[in-house]
A protein has these predicted regions:
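C-terminal binding/interaction regions
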Residues: 1-55, 60-77, 83-162
Length: 162
């Protein structure tokens, strides 16, 4: 089993020192889903939500969330993202909206946390903009889809891993 890297032997938290690691290309994608009512789904799909373009605002919020990851997660490094994209897929049958946040950089540490923070922020924004219509929305299944680069190499999520 791998050791935790964010703790010293005495148990105190520490930001991992990455100064000796080479700058390499890093990329990650994360996903998550929000389950909404038929009313919310229609309002988002038809651009009739009272607060405006829900997915447009959520896309920008997801990008901002990814960029501000190190301000939210205490031991994360500040990562100079070279790209961040947030996309959405709407499933009419299940009244759900799935977000994917893809991030990349050239640096000393990965961008998984930025992708996770981006997708989480996008989904939270959908909730915020639609909560007047449906307080029972459920955010679920947030996880890394894929990551590449660095010492640990390429990873692709396999559903049966859980």
């Amino acid at each position: 089993m791998a050791e935790f890297t964010h703790f010293k032997k005495d148990g105190s938290a520490v930001m991992v020192d990455v100064h000796e690691k080479p700058d390499t290309y890093r990329a990650a994608s994360a996903t998550g889903t929000i389950q909404v009512s038929p009313e919310v789904f229609a309002a988002v799909r038809d651009h009739t939500a009272k607060k405006g373009d829900v997915l447009g605002v959520a896309r920008l919020a997801g990008i901002m969330g990814a960029k501000k990851n190190a301000e939210l997660i205490p031991l994360c490094h500040i990562v100079p993202l070279t790209n961040c994209e947030v996309t959405f897929t709407m499933d009419e049958d299940t009244h759900s909206i799935t977000a994917v946040c893809t991030t990349s950089c050239v640096g000393k540490t990965g961008v998984e946390m930025e992708a996770l923070t981006g997708v989480s922020t996008a989904l939270l924004t959908i909730y915020d903009m639609c909560k007047a219509m449906d307080r029972g929305m459920m955010i679920r299944d947030i996880h890394i889809l894929e990551k590449d680069g660095g010492k640990s190499g390429h990873y692709i999520y396999q559903k049966e891993e859980k």
